[in-house]
Amino acid sequence: MGHMVNAIYQIDEFVNLGANSIETDVSFDDNANPEYTHHGIPCDCGRSCLKWKNYNDFLKGLRSATTPGNSKYQSKLILVVFDLKTGSLYDNQASEAGKKLAKNLLKHYWNNGNNGGRAYIVLSIPDLNHYPLIKGFTDTLKQEGHPELLEKVGYDFSGNDAVGDVAKAYKKAGVSGHVWQSDGITNCLLRGLTRVKEAVANRDSGNGYINKVYYWTVDKRATTRDALDAGVDGVMTNYPDVIADVMSEAAYKNKVRLATYEDSPWVTFKK
């Protein structure tokens, strides 16, 4: 996953470096409208924190990059994680944010269900208390007459909360399936793999809530190897070419590969 892809030109930049997925930050205005693709200061070491685009305009650019037949089409780009910056919202605005997010995606990305972008979408929420965002989102797509698009949508709570607490939040939100579990920290700091291994164990238990596990932000070859050895399904990185190099090493080239559009992001991979 290419990290912090917040300008339209960066979509091509990261995919051309080897990414099959991108992560994009979404900020909200005071009325819970998705406003900009913007991270802000501070952000990862070695990156510009200030790139941004109007959210709806970014969605249109993303749609072009993920619609077969479009001149901007990137066939390798199959998944987009929206890092929802809901920290600016009150808890009671979460549901409204979900409703507005659904309407924006439906209109500007999915083209109202008429040959829109094909990428899978993961809604990544930093606060467990904002679980109503999920129901606001799913209910709105159903009310707008497009429940089939929920097959393209997954969920993540990104706050590094205890795995058991995350499971409870999903239960409240009515989610069973399509769950990606993130774990990580900015590349400026070190973080061990203890919680990653706990999430992988939940994924592989047969009765856990997790379908996929990803780790962020992974920029070094040694960290990439450690994450792959821990059994993650994906890593988020500022340097997709570094990840590609490690995946081509003798220890990994016959064990892991980049996912393609034919691989379901919601089905747990069985070894």
Curated annotation (Swiss-Prot):
UniProt enzyme class: lyase
CDD domains: GDPD_like_SMaseD_PLD
Residues that bind Mg(2+): 23, 25, 83
BP terms from Gene Ontology: killing of cells of another organism; lipid catabolic process
One Pfam family here: GDPD_2
Binding note for cofactor: Binds 1 Mg(2+) ion per subunit.
Enzyme Commission no: 4.6.1.-
Catalyzed reactions: an N-(acyl)-sphingosylphosphocholine = an N-(acyl)-sphingosyl-1,3-cyclic phosphate + choline; an N-(acyl)-sphingosylphosphoethanolamine = an N-(acyl)-sphingosyl-1,3-cyclic phosphate + ethanolamine; a 1-acyl-sn-glycero-3-phosphocholine = a 1-acyl-sn-glycero-2,3-cyclic phosphate + choline; a 1-acyl-sn-glycero-3-phosphoethanolamine = a 1-acyl-sn-glycero-2,3-cyclic phosphate + ethanolamine
Protein purpose: Dermonecrotic toxins cleave the phosphodiester linkage between the phosphate and headgroup of certain phospholipids (sphingolipid and lysolipid substrates), forming an alcohol (often choline) and a cyclic phosphate. This toxin acts on sphingomyelin (SM). It may also act on ceramide phosphoethanolamine (CPE), lysophosphatidylcholine (LPC) and lysophosphatidylethanolamine (LPE), but not on lysophosphatidylserine (LPS), and lysophosphatidylglycerol (LPG). It acts by transphosphatidylation, releasing exclusively cyclic phosphate products as second products.
Family: Belongs to the arthropod phospholipase D family. Class II subfamily.
Name the record gives this protein: Dermonecrotic toxin LhSicTox-alphaIA2aiv
Species per Swiss-Prot/TrEMBL record: Loxosceles hirsuta
